[in-house]
């Protein structure tokens, strides 16, 4: 595995790979890698001749009162996970390397960002789309891999790639969970022991809602109220949202049918956790 820290060297490598016709699987991350990331890397390894992993904590996607400064970082751990999962190139640029001067151009994304985290975190997805435009141009991927834990991000990226005719296939990968159901996340390290126990109720609330849908409930308001009430009863967290939309358009539905997403965000004392399920309802 080769570690690359400059845009110029990474572009030179991927230009040569592209010219030789090799397929490139790209996994963009903010580091502090866990089993969810490892799953993305293994899928990229299975489906491509070359695997590129980027580790970059992107300041553009953090709001003024968010956790940019304390976001967990451990490049030694990330290197080990990368090596264990068959990465060929680890792209590890500094902020100064990615943004040598103030951006004069950013990518604004609309519609799919009007709800869920996009509504709660203004500017977040513009930051995500901007850094991905840069990373896609630097790494020239055939396929790019994203976890469905942030299903809104996947929907936004799919729309952005389609709208700009970017020649990359977006590959969504199912959420990876702990044995007790908690969605794996780099931010889980912020949870206290009690909060870690309470956080299990996030996924449980989604499973209960899924059972109600499978039993025939088709009123989205009843489903989302069920989820909110369950979380508020079983945790000390604050529900940021518990919403149900068509997926991937993220538009309102009057009836639970077709492909839908039920997504939640809950704030604990030091961390905000997200989770979701997607279903196809007949």
From Swiss-Prot:
Entry binding sites for beta-alanine: 61
Molecular function terms from GO: ATP binding; pantoate-beta-alanine ligase activity
Positions of transmembrane segments: none
Reactions accelerated catalytically: (R)-pantoate + beta-alanine + ATP = (R)-pantothenate + AMP + diphosphate + H(+)
EC assignment: 6.3.2.1
Other observations noted: The reaction proceeds by a bi uni uni bi ping pong mechanism.
Subunit structure: Homodimer.
Family to which the UniProt record says this protein belongs: Belongs to the pantothenate synthetase family.
Protein name (record): Pantothenate synthetase
